[in-house]
Amino acid sequence: MKIGLFIGGAGSAGTLHGQISQIVEAEKAGFDSLWAAHIMDIDVMTMLSMAAEQTTRIEIGTAVTPTFLRHPIAMAQQALTVQKVANGRFTLGLGVNHKPVVEGRLGMKFHRPWRHMFEYLNIVHSLTREGKVDYEGEIFSANTQFTMSSLPEIPVLLAALGPRMLNTAGELADGTITWMTGTETLRRYIVPTINDAAHR
């Protein structure tokens, strides 16, 4: 069994160097992974790339990075960069966030979240696995090609609880990230839904 930690919040532990120190100490303590939330003032992917340079073994991931903050091309660029620094230890966790945050803080319309994520994942998937994309969707369009000599594999997890997002997690992602979910819900609903979608 692997054991990981989740960090993200206020106070000294929520500062840039405070979070990096937590990851370094977690590796020393023998934890297998550390997951960081994109909240408060810190760009979590930048922080994780800095922490990756100070660690060698612990797996690191976002739980989660909000998709409304970056175009999927920019997200793929940054994820590939972090994975290069982390030497394969990085997992990208994505989520659409919440309507009060997207509309209240960002001033954007929280419109068709499932369609937003479906198109977003298709673009990120193409860029991180093939290095190129030619996509014209209802919300996003993307046409570009990366010049990296090699593309590091990046596991992608999707924050999902509802049936459409869970199906998308099974079809297009490598799994899900849940929030305040009990074991019975995982056993009876979330795991079977994702597994069914993954095997279609």
Question: For each of these PLM feature ranges, what is it?
Answer:
Residues 1-200:
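Active-site-adjacent structural elements that line small-molecule/cofactor binding pockets in enzymes
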